[in-house]
């Protein structure tokens, strides 16, 4: 209708305002006056209503010059004599004006408002947004009894700049920004080159001495089917495991923070090998990004098999029998869940019961590797922290529980800060925290 609209409001003695519309393409003045008064009557409205009106009529692109015309009274006792006013207030614009004067949306009134002084009053220049033209609202004293001094005292000079961070909505010319995915979690503070020579040399030595299993005096059977192998993973092997997990973890199928549909998150970072797992869907072959879960490195499987053999040797030695495989069945893992706990990480008491019924019925064990900071590990027959027993798992320890102990409740109460070996941190650049690998068979 109009290329650009500038609106002016005159402040009266009752703090009401007079509506002006300014058009660069029209120089007509539309006014209506009562036959009983020499002063033109004007359309009046409360300040709040006109603020609502202002926010619903965004400025339009127009010419550089501004000319004004006035809207006269819409009072039924003094009907407007101008067809232009009737035309302007008819149809869509009149309905919009009537509807929007009662607008309840107050947030949009808080849009950026730029004020500057004029010689005859104070002008509010309302910005519609960055890069948008502005409309003008004049507050002039029109009370004949008011003096010029009182009029000048009403002049204000306020300048507000829109703050996008605090505004409850985006400007008209600002398109919604796409929320970017968080970068992959890196368990290391810097990138190091891979070096698998330690694990490979250890595997060759293990193949040569497979029949001879030396049992450390530090190893112990905690309960039937539950064995702790202290310092089973040598420092060099720990470094190689960290590097391997880091290489897999920074990929799209790597570490993530699992959570529930209600929004709560586990206090750890997780990566799944062999099969994907999360608290909602349990096990599945594909990951959340619709791709196959990474395979378990062969070197990891070799370490698990050797740990189980050493646990069998320990059970046979302490029991005086050769019935270890019945107490702790042999297991070839096809799932590895890698968890990284920060210094504040923890995991509540739970049972590992998402594997197949056959796997659980046979008591196929869970094998857990600990690397980095030590952890206070809890276990018990019930989900009761007060009754649970505890053991400290240090870097290099391997914990195995199967058979009768397969369905025990277990969890991580706390991480002991600054307890990781300095040689491990220096060589692997592992972040402060605990890296835990748990192997199982589905």
From Swiss-Prot:
Domain of life, per lineage: Eukaryota
Cofactor note: Binds 1 Fe(2+) ion per subunit.
InterPro entries tied to this protein: Alkb, AlkB-like, AlkB-like_sf, Oxoglu/Fe-dep_dioxygenase_dom
Biased composition annotated in UniProt, kind: Basic and acidic residues: 170-183
One cellular component (GO) term of this entry: cytoplasm
The protein's name in its UniProt record: DNA N(6)-methyladenine demethylase ALKBH1D
Species for this entry: Arabidopsis thaliana (Mouse-ear cress)
Polar residues bias: start-end ranges: 135-144
Family recorded in the similarity comment: Belongs to the alkB family.
One Gene Ontology MF term: metal ion binding
Localization terms from the record: Nucleus; Cytoplasm
Phenotype of null mutants: Elevated DNA N(6)-methyladenine (6 mA) methylation levels. Plants lacking ALKBH1A and ALKBH1D show delayed seed germination associated with dysregulation of seed germination key regulators (e.g. FUS3, TPC1 and SPHK1) due to a high 6 mA DNA methylation state.
PANTHER family: 2-OXOGLUTARATE-DEPENDENT DIOXYGENASE FAMILY PROTEIN, ALKYLATED DNA REPAIR PROTEIN ALKB-RELATED
EC number: 1.14.11.51
Disulfide bridge positions per record: none
Tissue-by-tissue expression: Expressed at low levels in roots, seedlings and rosette leaves, but barely in cauline leaves, stems, siliques and flowers.
Low complexity biased stretches: 145-154
Function (record text): Dioxygenase that catalyzes DNA N(6)-methyladenine (6 mA) demethylation to modulate gene expression and regulate seed germination.
An annotated GO BP: regulation of seed germination
Bias type Basic residues, positions: 157-167
Binding site for Fe cation: 350, 352, 410
Keywords tagged on the record: Cytoplasm, Dioxygenase, DNA damage, DNA repair, Iron, Metal-binding, Nucleus, Oxidoreductase
Catalytic activity: an N(6)-methyl-2'-deoxyadenosine in DNA + 2-oxoglutarate + O2 = a 2'-deoxyadenosine in DNA + formaldehyde + succinate + CO2
Listed cofactors: Fe(2+)
């Amino acid at each position: 209708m109009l290329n650009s609209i500038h609106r002016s409001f005159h402040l009266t003695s009752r703090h009401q305002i007079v509506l002006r519309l300014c058009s660069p393409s029209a120089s007509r003045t539309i006014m209506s006056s009562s036959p009983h008064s020499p002063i033109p009557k004007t359309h009046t409205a409360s300040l709040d209503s006109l603020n609502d009106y202002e926010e619903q009529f965004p400025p339009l692109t127009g010419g550089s010059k501004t000319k004004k015309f006035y809207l006269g009274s819409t009072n039924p006792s003094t009907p407007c004599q101008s067809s232009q006013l009737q035309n302007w207030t008819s149809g869509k614009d009149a309905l919009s004006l009537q509807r929007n004067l009662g607008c309840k949306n107050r947030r949009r009134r808080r849009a950026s408002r730029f004020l500057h002084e004029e010689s005859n009053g104070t002008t509010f220049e309302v910005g519609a947004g960055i890069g948008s033209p502005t409309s003008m609202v004049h507050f002039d004293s029109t009370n004949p009894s008011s003096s010029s001094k009182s009029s000048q005292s009403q002049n204000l000079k306020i300048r507000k700049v829109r703050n996008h961070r605090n505004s409850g909505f985006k400007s008209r010319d600002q398109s919604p920004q796409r929320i970017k995915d968080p970068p992959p979690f890196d368990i290391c503070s810097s990138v190091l080159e891979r070096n698998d020579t330690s694990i490979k040399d250890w595997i060759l030595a293990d193949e040569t001495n497979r029949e001879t299993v030396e049992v450390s005096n530090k190893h112990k059977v905690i309960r039937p089917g539950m064995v702790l192998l202290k310092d089973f993973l040598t420092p060099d092997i720990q470094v190689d495991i960290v590097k391997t997990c880091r290489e897999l973890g920074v990929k799209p199928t790597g570490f993530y923070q699992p959570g529930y549909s209600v929004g709560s998150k586990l206090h750890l970072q997780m990566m799944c090998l062999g099969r994907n797992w999360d608290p909602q869907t349990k096990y599945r072959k594909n990951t959340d990004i619709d791709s196959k879960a990474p395979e378990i490195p062969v070197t990891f499987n070799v370490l698990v098999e050797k740990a189980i053999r050493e646990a069998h040797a320990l059970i046979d030695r302490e029991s005086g029998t050769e019935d270890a495989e019945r107490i702790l069945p042999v297991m070839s893992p096809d799932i590895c869940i890698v968890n990284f706990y920060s210094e504040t990480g923890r995991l509540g008491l739970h049972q590992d019961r998402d594997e197949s019924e056959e796997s659980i019925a046979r008591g196929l064990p869970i094998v857990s590797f600990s690397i980095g900071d030590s952890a206070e590990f809890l276990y018990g027959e019930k989900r009761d922290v007060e009754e649970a027993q505890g053991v400290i798992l240090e870097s290099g320890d391997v914990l195995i529980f199967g058979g009768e102990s397969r369905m025990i409740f277990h969890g991580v109460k706390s991480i002991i800060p600054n307890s990781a070996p300095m040689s491990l941190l220096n060589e692997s650049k592992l972040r402060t925290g605990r890296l835990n690998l748990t192997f199982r068979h589905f």
